[in-house]
Amino acid sequence: MKINEFIKNNLKVKVLNEDPSMRHIMTSTRLPHIVCTDGFTMSVQVGYSLYSEPKKVAKRYSKVEIGYPSERESLLEEYVELSIFDERFVDYTDTIYPYVPVKLVDKVLKKHGGIDLTETLRKAA
């Protein structure tokens, strides 16, 4: 399953303001933490206040926000948002990765055996 299909099937949207002029910016969106078949996990999020494109609820996304992968993933490194307090210590798992292209996310998922949908949804419940 590719990431846009996962988003389409699992995105939870809560409208916080019914005013039509505010509706697109007053929403809360949430996706379950992804678990891959090899055990790798990461958060993938999209929406107005997140590092994704587009920044609204959409049918397809070109870029997504990734957060807190369970291990360092070399395919994502160029997108890491780091706060380096000590140059000898860089934690690639306790941070976010803004505006990651969905094609790259699909490569990461494939590398880790794809999404284990049963485990992903079980942990989200």
How would you name each of these model-derived features?
Residues 1-2:
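Glycine-rich short-loop/terminal segments
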